[in-house]
Curated annotation (Swiss-Prot):
This is Chaperonin GroEL. HAMAP family: CH60 (MF_00600). Gene3D superfamilies: GroEL, GroEL-like equatorial domain, TCP-1-like chaperonin intermediate domain. ATP binds at residues 30-33, 51, 87-91, 415, 479-481, 495. Together with its co-chaperonin GroES, plays an essential role in assisting protein folding. The GroEL-GroES system forms a nano-cage that allows encapsulation of the non-native substrate proteins and provides a physical environment optimized to promote and accelerate protein folding. It comes from Ectopseudomonas mendocina (strain ymp). SUPFAM superfamilies: GroEL apical domain-like (SSF52029), GroEL equatorial domain-like (SSF48592), GroEL-intermediate domain like (SSF54849).
Length: 548
């Protein structure tokens, strides 16, 4: 095991503070409407230019192991805020830096670190409760657009496109962000249920100009096993042919003789048919087949429930207004399922979302929810260069998370004002002893840091602005984009309450841990110079004696 170096007390905390400040100073340059850019070098390709706090934080590793520990802990603040609300990373970093700097000064002056932490925690709880009271619901499109704009570093086009997407697919709908091919941002909305499986054979195509298979008013046969024997399918095919309607088969797979027979029937015009693999894998495939069954009013043909393919009748088939298949996707439009059944299924999936602890499962469940409840919107980000595209895509994703958070917990005045207003919650707050009171006072000063930094980045005088904002009340604040004072909500400067709350909680949590650090352990630096390789005799250097 490699030797370790251990630092204690003040010398450990000083090293940690250097790392905290290096990382926070790089990140906080991006805060606010007049925040600066940070250029990140890549091991290959062009450097990335960004105004996204968490992207900057992720890139920073320091050479000194003890300083690096401080930097990594602040990086953790940014990640925690990002995981909780998808945004607010820069605010969280600025708050953490202020808490750690103020806290370590107090520790150096002889205060008890544990009492300081208790004071900070007490004040944080009071401010979080106050933020929840300050929050106003974010219901209309205009407010959603404003939140998106602020989160995307004051880019109106991003705010507007997110509001439009939410308008079209509803608050529950899935909105995905992709890299576009043009210069402008584009929004495309998929009505109905879409899943990522295309037709099993190009011979099913009936619209050669667009390379799609389109079925009008089809019946849907849903099977949770492979179909390779055509005999199993014959009873259903004959019934469908008599009914004179097209058929879509969704099965684990259709292969061999069965697929060949379907293709021949389709080409001869006996039965208009298309086949597609069921989406997902394993248990998720079964659940998604069940979703399609409920959406279209059909039944999944499964041996688990005692149904075999030979015994399937028209009653077991689902109905839809239209189905469109291309080589990658299948879209079912206007399924004929009973609304009450669909709502019950949606409620069931919502419950699963609340209960699951896995982020991946949660994301997949939410996709299923959207496919049943609303639709899917795709925002294609446009830009002139690859570098700009990456930077813009990161901002669109941030803005999307922020708007979701705003819809969830409401909005508060932006620009650091909500935190300053929430200070009234700790006006008369007292700790159990004097050191806890110092912790409360410390947080009171730290909470002003985001507003101070926004003003500093805009080239203003932070103390003057903070003083003027404190004298005001309600939504009164400073608009750094235009250098004016006024009602932040009316000026459209809003932050999601969840983002502000998560930023403060993450910063107070990690800040408190750093203040109470007494020892740090890291790998000892290797002092020995690397051994020189054997120089192999250095022949021919004889007559150089006179050079000394």
């Amino acid at each position: 095991m490699a030797a370790k170096e251990v630092k204690f007390g003040d010398s450990a905390r000083k090293k940690m503070l250097v790392g905290v400040n290096v990382l926070a100073d790089a990140v906080k340059a991006t805060l606010g409407p007049k925040g600066r850019n940070v250029v990140l070098a890549k091991s290959f390709g062009a450097p990335t230019i960004t105004k996204d706090g968490v992207s900057v934080a992720k890139e920073i590793e320091l050479k000194d192991a003890f300083e690096n520990m401080g930097a990594q802990l602040v990086k953790d603040v940014a990640s925690k805020a990002n995981d909780a609300a998808g945004d607010g990373t820069t605010t969280a970093t600025v708050l953490a830096q202020a808490i750690v700097n103020e806290g370590l000064k107090s520790v150096a002056a002889g205060m008890n670190p544990m009492d300081l932490k208790r004071g900070i925690d007490k004040a944080t709880s009071a401010i979080v409760a106050q933020l929840k009271d300050l929050a106003k619901p974010c219901a209309d499109s205009k407010a959603i657009a404003q939140v998106g704009t602020i989160s995307a570093n004051s880019d109106n086009s991003i705010g507007d496109i997110i509001a439009e997407a939410m308008d079209k697919v509803g608050k529950e709908g899935v909105i995905t962000v992709e890299e576009g091919s043009g210069l402008e941002n584009e929004l495309s909305v998929v009505e109905g249920m879409q899943f990522d499986r295309g037709y099993l054979s190009p011979y099913f195509i009936n619209k050669p100009d667009t390379m799609v298979a389109e079925l009008e008013g089809p019946l849907l046969l849903l099977v949770d096993k492979k179909i390779s024997n055509i005999r199993e399918l014959l009873p259903v095919l004959e019934a469908v042919a008599k009914a004179g309607r097209p058929l879509l088969i969704v099965a684990e797979d259709v292969e061999g003789e069965a697929l060949a027979t379907l293709v021949v029937n389709n080409m001869r015009g006996i039965v208009k048919v298309a086949a597609v693999k069921a989406p997902g894998f394993g248990d998720r495939r079964k659940a998604m087949l069940q979703d399609i069954a409920i959406l279209t009013g059909g039944t999944v043909i499964s041996e688990e429930v005692g149904l075999s393919l030979e015994s399937a009748t028209l009653e077991h088939l689902g109905n839809a207004k239209r189905v469109v298949l291309n080589k990658d996707n299948t879209t079912i439009i206007d399924g004929a399922g009973a609304q009450a059944d669909i709502e019950a299924r949606v409620a069931q999936i919502r419950k699963q979302v609340e209960e699951t602890s896995s982020d991946y499962d949660k994301e997949k469940l939410q996709e299923r929810l959207a496919k049943l409840a609303g639709g899917v919107a795709v925002i294609k980000v446009g830009a002139a260069t690859e570098v700009e595209m990456k930077e813009k895509k990161a901002r669109v994703e941030d803005a999307l998370h922020a708007t979701r958070a705003a819809v969830e917990e409401g909005v508060v005045p932006g620009g650091g004002v909500a935190l300053v207003r929430a200070l009234q919650a700790i006006e008369g707050l007292k700790g159990d002893n004097e050191d806890q009171n110092v912790g409360i006072a410390l947080l009171r000063r730290a909470v002003e840091a985001p507003l101070r930094q926004i003003v500093a980045n805009a080239g203003g005088e932070p103390s003057v602005v903070v003083d003027k904002v404190k004298q005001g009340s309600g939504n009164f604040g400073f608009n750094a984009a235009t250098d004016t004072y006024g009602d932040m909500i009316e000026m459209g400067i809003l932050d999601p309450a969840k983002v502000t709350r998560s930023a403060l909680q993450a910063a107070a949590s990690i800040g408190g841990l750093m203040i109470t650090t007494e020892a740090m352990v890291a790998e000892a630096a290797d002092d020995k110079a690397p051994a020189m390789p054997d120089m192999g005799g250095m022949g021919g250097m004889g007559g150089m004696g006179g050079m000394m």
